[in-house]
Amino acid sequence: MYPSKALQIMKSVLNGGNAPFLLGGTGVGKSAVVKQLAEELANDREIVSDVINPTAKQFGWIDFRLSLYESVDLGGLPYIGDDNQQKRAFLGNLPIGGEGVLFFDEYAQAHPSVQAIVGQIIYERRLGEYILPEGWKVICAGNRSSDRAGSNALPSHVVGRCSIINFE
């Protein structure tokens, strides 16, 4: 599939309220196509990386290379609150306002516990008490298990929650 076609499909998927998932071999340009989509969605606003609350003149870009994360990095550290209820302390790496793209790359190489956490963000746009702001789009990418890139098969709940786009 050509990058222009992938861009068109991803826009359609996002407009339908779903998360696109680019699935393809190593080095075929999946990440570059997602970055290009972010540039188009920014609509002449400044793209800012790793800013969790971009201003109206900015468009956020947060790129999680999931193979580098552990579940506590995304799921937060558990603690007991003043009300004796278990809570989670997040590390401040998830968006709290504004608009942008939350890109989960190397999804298939991530540990299954990380995949499960991201699955909740994809489907429910939340993680425990954390709620992903409306202005943020979730996009995923990864290699196929047949690519021998250390990839795991995608969990069925994630396949059901995303629109898989095969990218060559």
Please identify what each model-predicted range represents:
Residues 1-168:
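AAA+ P-loop NTPase catalytic core and its hallmark functional loops
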